[in-house]
């Protein structure tokens, strides 16, 4: 699990989006960003999570929060995910797991007694100066957007 904590500077990264355009975290300096890591596009939990963000994106935007979803999927799979689910925010491909390792969300997991390596579903709210404001983990996919919006609503706007 991540060793990052609120107050730490968010690790810098450059990743391709679903149409192979390079996106840098530094492109968002001056804006708040929700960087959320998810295991695999088009799977049930990840689809629920992404569609709930899609359906509530205006609420995130009203809090001046941009959304970036990151997974180990290739750009073609991300494009399919975006098109099939009509996603209205940016998905990034971390095929080599370099960024997920920088954020400390890639590691050994156990499912039904089998060990494997994968993404720990984790979200980082990064402030407009590039520092981690809040880390969200151990949540149900269907509640992800509610937890983050509740947190955003509890803060004074900046």
From Swiss-Prot:
CDD domains hit by this protein: PRX_BCP (cd03017)
E.C. numbers: 1.11.1.24
Domain of life of the organism encoding this protein: Bacteria
Record-level GO BP terms: cell redox homeostasis; cellular response to oxidative stress
Active site, UniProt feature: 46
Gene Ontology cellular-component terms listed: cytoplasm
Family: Belongs to the peroxiredoxin family. BCP/PrxQ subfamily.
Function summary: Thiol-specific peroxidase that catalyzes the reduction of hydrogen peroxide and organic hydroperoxides to water and alcohols, respectively. Plays a role in cell protection against oxidative stress by detoxifying peroxides and as sensor of hydrogen peroxide-mediated signaling events.
Protein name: Putative peroxiredoxin bcp
Species in which this protein is naturally found: Buchnera aphidicola subsp. Schizaphis graminum (strain Sg)
Annotated gene: bcp
């Amino acid at each position: 699990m991540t060793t990052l904590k609120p107050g730490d500077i968010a690790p810098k990264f450059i990743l391709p989006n679903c149409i192979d355009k390079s996106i840098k975290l530094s492109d968002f300096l001056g804006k708040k960003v929700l960087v959320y890591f998810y295991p695999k596009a088009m799977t049930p939990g990840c689809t629920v999570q992404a569609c709930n963000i899609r359906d509530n994106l205006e609420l995130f935007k009203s809090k001046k929060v941009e959304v970036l979803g990151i997974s180990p999927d290739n750009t073609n799979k991300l494009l399919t995910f975006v098109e099939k689910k009509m996603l209205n925010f940016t998905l990034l491909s971390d095929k080599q797991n370099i960024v997920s390792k920088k954020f400390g969300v890639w590691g050994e997991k156990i499912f039904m007694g089998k060990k494997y390596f994968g993404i720990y579903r984790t979200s980082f709210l990064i402030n407009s100066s590039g520092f981690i404001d809040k880390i969200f983990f151990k949540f149900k996919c269907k509640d992800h957007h509610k937890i983050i919006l509740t947190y955003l609503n509890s803060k004074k706007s900046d």
